[in-house]
Curated annotation (Swiss-Prot):
Pfam families: Ribosomal_S20p
Stated role: Binds directly to 16S ribosomal RNA.
GO biological process: translation
Recorded family membership: Belongs to the bacterial ribosomal protein bS20 family.
InterPro entries documented for this protein: Ribosomal_bS20 (IPR002583), Ribosomal_bS20_sf (IPR036510)
Keywords tagged on the record: Ribonucleoprotein, Ribosomal protein, RNA-binding, rRNA-binding
GO cellular component labels: cytosol; small ribosomal subunit
The protein, known as: Small ribosomal subunit protein bS20
Amino acid sequence: MANHKSAEKRIRQTIKRTERNRFYKTKVKNIIKAVREAVAINDVAKAQERLKIANKELHKFVSKGILKKNTASRKVSRLNASVKKIALA
């Protein structure tokens, strides 16, 4: 265990940040999974609706500093491509 006050504080901060990061990472995964599920069943309307939500949420995470800009853009771009693919088919 920590012997210094500053080390104890760092442990508390790490625990708090870990919980917060886990929450956001799970949320990102669930958002992406929702779009992919709609694409898998070829439901264009649902996929486009969920893509719109995913785009908004992922860019919100960028502004909060949870995701990097390029990471969010890459994820949105790939989701967009998959939705576009079923829309044209």
